[in-house]
Each structure stands twice: as structure tokens, then as C-alpha cells.
Amino acid sequence: MKICRHSESTDAPLASPTSRRELLQLAVAAACWPLLAAAQERSPELLPLRTTGLQHFGMQVADVEVAGQFYGRLFSPTLTKEAEPPLRYYVKIGSDSIAIGGANGRASRIDHYCALIEEYHPAAMIERLRTEGLTVGNQGLVGDPDGLRLQLLGMSESASSLPAEALASRRPSVRITDEGPVVTPIALERVVLLVSDLERALPFYRLFFGAESRRDADGVWFQLADTRLGVLTAPSGEPPRIDHYCVNVAPFDRDTVAAKLTALGATLAGSDDADELHFKDSDGIHVVLRAA
């Protein structure tokens, strides 16, 4: 943190103002000083984030309609979407959500993840991060050394904080099927990132989330309220990426859900955890369902 210091002795006498302009300048400075002091006191509290946890993540896919149908049938048949083109769906996963947008010719991927922040002050955060050499882009997105993007979002900015009428106007809803969802989602459980160099990446994540809660041979884990963020070393030869997400769901029959996933076009994957069911959706995105 850069600190400005005066070179003059603090014991030097104050010069007497010689004009109305100087008197006005002194009055303005006196009025502003409490605000500046308060800002300086607040700035250390901006980081690590005071977060209520991971709130949503976004994916970019080849066909938004197809992906919306898949995730709507899996988690929540009633989707919301942006009122204006391009098509962008939002799928509820219990208290959290998935944002689905078009990849526009790029490979399908999880594009970003979002931490919801208490008492968030965007302008102050932008200035604070600038001192760390970080730039906050559109919609509060900031990238780690590999370009993996974290979205900073205040609780008051979240769509879930809007009154029902305002939300319906901003994001009209559409029901894609009369059938119930394959599983009953509760909330996002974790998001896992694969980075090219763990030690290079760690200062970024510690800046935002504080000390890790656990470290093992594969990487580190941060506990963010009731959610977890895994920052692991990418296997040799594989690119850095947001690798997968896991949703806590109500207890389910594994064979029944596996059969329904296959019917929807998913590809099942192995897992060492009996409480988890791993699969890849039709865009190749890795998804985990965990029985809560």
C-alpha cells in the first residue's frame, strides 16, 4: 500500500492565510478530512472479501437453447432470461444460479464464478485493486494470473435482491416442461479451478479470500461461508480452466438419476466418492451432484 508522507516537520508553525481563497481551501480541506480518514480506515476491510459465499457461475455454450433445456430439466423447469437479445438463460440451483450465454464460436466452458459480497463498494474496490496491479473489468470481473475470472457482486446488486415485479420485468420467465426436475438442488457446494502455477496463483486468491482452509498434494481449498473454492494444479499438458462445479442436492437414487442424465445426453464419469455423481453435459462441462 502506498503511503504519502509530508517532508516538512510536523512541529513547523502553520502559515497564516492571506486571502479569501486560502481560507476557503482550508475550510474545504477541514470538511473533507473526516471523509478521507474514514475511507482510509475502511480500505483495509475491503480485502479479504466479506463474502456470503459463491452465488453463481456463468457458462458459455454452443447452443444456449439446448443447454437451457438440459439444465432446466435437470435442476429447475422454470428459467428466466434477459428481456433483450442475445439469449441468456438463468437456471436456479436452490438458493444459487447458473448463467448460460453463447460461446460465439469459442469452445464451451465455465466462463466465470461469482462471490457475493456484504457492504460492497465498487469504486473503492477498483481503487484498492489498482494498488495491487489488478484491473476490474465490466460487470466486476477480475482475472487471476491465468485469466480465470472472478466476479465481484454486492448483495444489493444481485438479481435475487430485486422485488418480484422488477425481476419479472428485467428477466421474464419461461417454463420448458411440465415435468419435475431430475434432482432437487439445494445450493452450490464448490467450484474447482485448475491453475498452471499454484504458487504464482496463491497471492491472488489469498488477497480476496484470506488464508486457505486446507492444503493437500493437489492444491488448496478456501472455505467461503457454506461454499468451497478449490484451486488445484492443472495436470501436466492440460490448460488452466474453471474445471467443474458441484451442487448439493436432496438425496437421490443413483441409478435412476444416472439413467435420466444419460437420456438427456450427459456422459457419466467415475467418482471415488459414494455421495457424488459426476458427469459431463452435452457441451463437455464437468458437473457434480452431491447428496446433502
Residue ranges and their predicted role:
Residues 14-18, 26, 49, 59-98, ...:
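Core segments of cupin and vicinal oxygen chelate
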Residues 39-65, 110-113, 157-202, 228, ...:
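N-terminal beta-strand motif that seeds the catalytic metal site of vicinal oxygen chelate
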Residues 40-43, 55-60, 71-139:
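Ordered, small/hydrophobic-rich secondary-structure cores
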Residues 1-18, 29-32:
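N-terminal secretory signal peptides
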Residues 62-66, 108-109, 113-149, 155, ...:
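Vicinal oxygen chelate
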Residues 96-100, 107, 148-151, 157-160, ...:
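Short, charged/polar, Gly/Pro-enriched secondary-structure boundary elements
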Residues 47-51, 63-65, 90-92, 104-107, ...:
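Short, low-complexity cationic-aromatic patches
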Residues 17-25, 31-45:
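N-terminal twin-arginine translocation
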